[in-house]
Amino acid sequence: MSSTRVLVLNSGSSSVKYQLIDMRDGERLAAGLVERIGERTSRLRHTLVAAGDTREQEGPIADHEAALKAVAAELGRDGLGLDSPELAAIGHRVVHGGEFFSEPTLIDENVLTEIERLIPVAPLHNPANLTGIRTAQALRPDLPQVAVFDTAFHTTMPESAARYAIDPKIADRYRIRRYGFHGTSHAYVSRETARLLGRAPGDVNVIVLHLGNGASASAVRGGRCVDTSMGLTPLEGLVMGTRSGDMDPAVIFHLMRVGGMSADEIDTLLNKRSGLFGLCGDNDMREIRRRVDEDDEQAGLAFDIYIHRLKKYIGAYYAVLGRVDAVAFTAGVGENSAPVREAAVAGLEGLGLAVDGGLNAVRGDGARLISPAGARVAVAVVPTDEEMEIATQTYALVSESGNPDLT
């Protein structure tokens, strides 16, 4: 029997998201989420996609091992268990791969060691990713396990974009450079944008705007990232739901010296109490837009600051690329907020950017153009699909490895 299924795992600090995908036709067989791991009120939500059948269970799930065993049991109830000969591999989302991992990688002890070494630059994510990998390995030690890194797509950035202007000895000692994040999404969306235009990815220059609670922009030339807005951490760049984005670093010294704040307090301020939330008390763009429509000044200023930063990055990446074929909006805000898309390109007609009001207002599930007919630069809404991208990269890698069970 051929093995064509890939289980995609995204292990967070207290959650596990998963999808089981058949790579013959891209069909999603099952999907689910285990949340509040380690609490008495843990919950597992499992969906058999084709049947539209969703099951939920609540109760204590002690750790990631128990969570994955519960996932395996739910899949087994549907005849899709981890012991199925049709399961080709497990693909793991790993947030930080540093400068070492530029492509999906078969996991062995050396890979695990390197992911562990990167914990200081990804303390919130890599430990949970490691736990998920080790738990999955314990459940299926014979099955190929593949790491797909959020940072990998950005390793093609030139040194002029990846380096900070500080002493290189210090930068190298502490691994300080611009890694970028959301790379799996940027890779998928840039490729799908080229498909939407009917062109090969290698022929297209795209500015991708991944706008969710976390937000990032990337400049993609011919399918390769040449710049991105996030840096050493996801704090750099665009204004986000709770993160400040770009800011004068001296603000930190000022808060320490004058405000008496500790490094941890400032970390919390900039990552969890800033951005849209810090400006107006809301990080949900829908609520912010409702308040804007009611002439709420705080919400209006927050929206204007958000859009101002977005415009700056669009302009900067236009300059970096030299020629832009498309600007693609993706993720929760990018896919669903017509006002954000309209405001982001307003006044940029000189760069060939505009949206058609009617097309922009239409809600849809698939990739679509929202620029006027004949526009010099296409403006598109392209739903991201990180799970499919992880599955695709995982299956391609294990297929190349020569497994005779794969077709």
Curated annotation (Swiss-Prot):
Q: Keywords, A to Z?
A: ATP-binding, Cytoplasm, Kinase, Magnesium, Metal-binding, Nucleotide-binding, Transferase
Q: Name one GO cellular component term.
A: cytoplasm
This protein's source sits in the domain of life called: Bacteria
- The positions annotated as site (Transition state stabilizer) read H182, R243
| Co-factor binding details | Mg(2+). Can also accept Mn(2+).
Family matches, as Pfam families: Acetate_kinase
What are the boundaries of the signal sequence? Answer: none
User: Transmembrane segments in this chain: where?
Assistant: none
Give the E.C. number(s): 2.7.2.1
**Subunit annotation:** Homodimer.
Question: Know the name of this protein?
Answer: Acetate kinase
* Encoding gene per record: ackA
